């Protein structure tokens, strides 16, 4: 005999909140040192020139400059920051 009567639909109605991941500064945008460029899980995009990689794989600017997305090789992306000339 069931101990709970017909309440399966209410038990299954939960969802986790979004983690606010993704690109925060896009290509060509000006960034200041310390600005977050990408929040990600794992290194989907790798760190290029003048950017740092946080322990949670967040990519952030180390200098003031412009964001540039590039290809590292055939199937890897990287992001760099180049100073304003």
UniProtKB/Swiss-Prot annotation:
One Pfam match, given by its short name, reads Ribosomal_L27
Keywords, ordered alphabetically = Ribonucleoprotein, Ribosomal protein
Please list the disulfide bridges.
Answer: none
Example GO biological process term? Answer: translation
Q: Which InterPro entries match?
A: Ribosomal_bL27, Ribosomal_bL27_CS
List GO molecular-function terms, semicolon-separated: structural constituent of ribosome
Q: Does the keyword Ribonucleoprotein apply?
A: yes
Q: Which GO terms describe its cellular component?
A: cytosolic large ribosomal subunit
- Membership in a protein family: Belongs to the bacterial ribosomal protein bL27 family.
Name of the featured protein = Large ribosomal subunit protein bL27
Q: Which gene encodes it?
A: rpmA
């Amino acid at each position: 005999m069931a101990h709970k009567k017909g309440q399966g639909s209410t038990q299954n109605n939960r969802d986790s909140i979004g983690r606010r991941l993704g690109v925060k500064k896009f290509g060509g945008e000006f960034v200041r040192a310390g600005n977050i460029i990408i929040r990600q899980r794992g290194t989907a995009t790798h760190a290029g020139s003048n950017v740092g990689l946080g322990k949670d794989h967040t990519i952030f600017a180390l200098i003031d400059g412009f964001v540039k997305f590039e290809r590292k090789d055939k199937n890897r992306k990287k992001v760099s920051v180049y100073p304003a000339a």
